[in-house]
Amino acid sequence: MTVTQTLQTWTVAETIIGIAGLAFTLLLGLLVGCASRKPDANELSARGWVDVTATLDPGTTPVYEGDAPMKFEFLKNMRTGDNFTLSVYSMGAHSGTHIDAPQHFIRTGGSVDQIPLEALTGTARVIDIADGVQAIDAAELNRHDWKGAKRVLFRTRSSLRSWMASPEFHRDFAYLAPDGAQLLADAGVALVGFDYLSAEQFGAPAPRTHQILLGRGIPIVEGLDLRPLQAGDYDLIVLPIKVRGHEGAPARAIARRTSASR
């Protein structure tokens, strides 16, 4: 090999190394940028589980009018000199995100510990209800793509206004009208969820919505925080505290986009 050929070989090699180094630098920068950027709620809902449980806090969590007030206190507290911390929670069974079991309005209905796990876990459809809609009746329901859904979650004005993160109780929350409840029950849904403290109209003369759903054995999840979600299908897990013989209990709820929706 001549000197000229040797120099040409070195030049080609240096060029290849330079290009490879530049590509590595760009890739590293991209990875670092992706790792340091915090994903927004929509990305989280597309990539993994999202907590749709309202945080329990006496200072920020609303309580249904007339229900037991929420009170948390420390019996022992390491911050005040004790050698361990011990808390007591006092609140109603229907505080924050919670489950209504059939026993809530049906005398012979099952208690919260008897709700089948199959009803509480599986695919759910989030329905976006416009801010101006308060009564979700059969006509309103049929304006949305809900048919075929096994579980239906309503994202209403309560999510748009962050009412589950505000201590003030609002009477004008959106609710499911009895004919809407009948439509869902007749379609065989396994669970219905709401983003405020009740699925029933405040001050309704009779609890027909609860009676229709719970009478069919359909549990109701109330007090969900659906702000991070958009309309669409999700995998849903709702697990209430296992309290024997009672009509309801606080629950933890998580959701993620179904693989078909990602």
Named regions from a protein language model:
Residues V12-E14, G18, G29-R262:
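Active-/binding-site microenvironments in catalytic and ligand-binding cores
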Residues M1-A13:
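N-terminal secretory signal peptides that target proteins for export/translocation
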